Amino acid sequence: MRNGPRVQPNGERAIVQIVVRDNNVEQALRALKKKMQREGTFREMKRRNHYEKPSEKKARQKAEAIRRARKLARKRAQREGLIAKRGGTTRR
């Protein structure tokens, strides 16, 4: 399953909805922030803040692809036992 923004059939993004229970606005705000973070809304807002030249966009996408490939290779190596999993040791 993809963690990208949800897109409706007409191509527009879905509206994020949060239910406020028992007038607990703080909890609703935390849930909204978490949902927006998960869907990449903050990253998208930051990216759209300024114009991005096509060459910059291409470089960013290439860097993201390299990052994804490295992460996938690292996870695969951890599964096969070639490298230790991160966070397993404690520092003193």
From Swiss-Prot:
GO terms for biological process: translation. Residues 51-67 have a biased composition (Basic and acidic residues). The gene is rpsU. Keywords: Ribonucleoprotein, Ribosomal protein. GO terms for cellular component: ribonucleoprotein complex; ribosome. PANTHER family: MITOCHONDRIAL 28S RIBOSOMAL PROTEIN S21, SMALL RIBOSOMAL SUBUNIT PROTEIN BS21M. Pfam families: Ribosomal_S21. Belongs to the bacterial ribosomal protein bS21 family. One of its GO terms (molecular function) is structural constituent of ribosome. Residues 37-92 are annotated as: Disordered. This is Small ribosomal subunit protein bS21. It comes from the Bacteria. The keyword Ribosomal protein applies. Residues 68-77 have a biased composition (Basic residues). It comes from Maricaulis maris (strain MCS10) (Caulobacter maris).
